[in-house]
From Swiss-Prot:
Homology family: Belongs to the type-B carboxylesterase/lipase family.
Tissue expression from the record: Fat body, the site of their biosynthesis, and the hemolymph where it is secreted.
Reaction catalysis annotation: juvenile hormone I + H2O = juvenile hormone I carboxylate + methanol + H(+); juvenile hormone III + H2O = juvenile hormone III carboxylate + methanol + H(+)
Glycosylation sites: N20
Species in which this protein is naturally found: Trichoplusia ni (Cabbage looper)
Name of this chain's protein: Juvenile hormone esterase, isoform B
EC nos: 3.1.1.59
Sorted UniProt keywords: Glycoprotein, Hydrolase, Serine esterase
Top-level EC class: hydrolase
One GO molecular-function entry: juvenile-hormone esterase activity
Function in brief: JH esterase plays a crucial role in the decrease of JH activity in lepidopteran insects, by hydrolyzing the methyl ester of JH. It is also involved in the transport of JH.
Amino acid sequence: LPSLSADAEAPSKIDTAYYNGTKTXXAPVYQYQFGVGXIEXLTYVFKGSQYQDIESPTAYQSK
């Protein structure tokens, strides 16, 4: 995963994240857009010290 730095694009802060209409988090969640290899606009959720792939249905159930 790309490392986050002060000069990275500012994240959009949202209070609640939804996955397929399901509420997944009550704490603030930060979403970052990255372009990695041939895959465009991968979205990661930065929560605490974890990176989670928002496209994964088990992302909010793991760890």
